[in-house]
Structures are given as structure tokens and as C-alpha cells.
Amino acid sequence: MDKNIANAMLMRLNKQDQVAALQSIGFTTVNENTPASDIAKYMQWAGTLLDLSLATLRIEDGEQVFFTASEWNSMSANNRSKYIRIGIRLRAECHQFIIAKSDCVDAGGNKTFKWGGYGTDLRGLKNYGSGNQGLYDTFDGKENTDVIIETLAGVKDTQGTVGAPAAEAARAYKACTLESDGIEDTTVWNLPALGELMLMAKYKTEINELITSMFGNQNIFTNDWYWSSTEYDASSSWGVDFNYGGVNTLGRQYAYRVRPLAAINTLSL
């Protein structure tokens, strides 16, 4: 057999294996026609941080549009005025989502929120004990937030907290409003699941650099504890320490920071 033909067949077989592997971990749009340069990007995305981009809403139609820092910085002021910046898109380790541009703050200026529901084991939320298989692979923040808000709406727990302050704050978050920005934020914001929150903590340095560049350092992740929407038991849920990256259970009667997240359900470049 001609050596060039043999090499071409080998390269094709290798690409077929790569495509099959990428498809098996969620990159379902990858196929044999995907350029080799994109295959390399998907392989990076599968194992580490692919990139961080500025997430915006286009004022004209409300569509989400993403820009690299260099793309945004090279735009004219007139072109920038057509978009509202809402957060940072993270693409890493087989996942992508939008991180809100700032932590939640209530009407009184408070920056921490109780989880709520102390004493209630929420039906519809899986209890993840310490070392529980799958704990670090929880990326269901939207589903969790839906359940938490619906279950605890108007319910006063044994510690006197009404509802689900942390989840409610995340869902009510607005990165922009019609009155102040010319467009209403219709993004569905959520209280992150533990796996989502851990990715944010893992790449905190890179995220904070882009946040500082795009929104100012007053909006960076602090070194405090942040709530996740992942349940431990009837009195505790999981949180992440953004100082050292530690993970632990936190009593729901205590108040910690909330950084909303918006899901992106596709995995394509």
C-alpha cells in the first residue's frame, strides 16, 4: 500500500477515535468533518480551561453575544454601545456557563444571604454526604434553584427564615434593566450547584482578572464562602471557600455570599 495512503488512513482512524471520545463526554456536535484545529480546542475544553469571554446582551434583540477581551477592546465606542455587559462566559472541563458580573446584594446593601429551609429535607434535591460519589459532578444549578424556590416559597423555617433567600436572590438577579440600560435582563440566573461553584473557584484568578478588566475590581470574587444549591441534609448545604478553594457543609441558618450563574445547554465552539 502506498505510504501516503497508509498515513492518511492512520490519521483518519485517529480522528475517528478522537471524535468518538469527544462525543462520549458530551460534545455531540463534533464529527469527522470538524476541522482538526477545532478538535484540538475541544480536547482542551474537555480537560482544562478553554477560555473566558465577556458575555453581553445585544440591545437590538436581547440575544447573548460573546467577545474575547481583545475583540471587545478593539471595538469602537459606538459598536460597544449596542451591547450590555452581563457577565463572564466560562468554558472549561466539558462545561460552559455564564457567571454574573457581580455578587448578589439586597435592597439594604447586604451581601450575604441565608440558604433557608432549615429542618426541611427538600424532596427533589439529592442529599450528597461527604465523599458521596458524584458530589463534585453536580452541574444542575437551574434545576436545584427551581426546586428550592418552589418548595420553600413562603415557608418559615425553625430558625425564623422565610423562603429561600440565597436561591431567591440568585433568581431575581438583574445584570441590566430597561430603565437604566435600555434592555431588560431576561437571563435565567441560578444558585450554582457545587460542581459549577467549584469550577469558578478553581479558575478564580483568571475570572477575576477579566472581571476587573471589564467591570472593575469591586466585582471580583472575594475570599469568602459562597453558597451552592447542592443539599447535604435537612439542616446543611454545600459551600465553597473562595480563599483556599475548600469545600464544606454550611448550616442553612447562616448567611454567605451568592454569585449567580446562567446555564448554557450546548457544547459547541
Give short role names for the model-derived ranges:
Residues 2-185, 252-255, 259-269:
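Short, compositionally biased
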Residues 2-18, 194-269:
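C-terminal, surface-exposed recognition/capping segments
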Residues 48, 75, 118, 192, ...:
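Enriched - but not universal
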Residues 99, 191-192:
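Short hydrophobic beta-strand that contains or immediately precedes a catalytic carboxylate
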Residues 186-190:
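Alpha-helical scaffolds flanking conserved acidic
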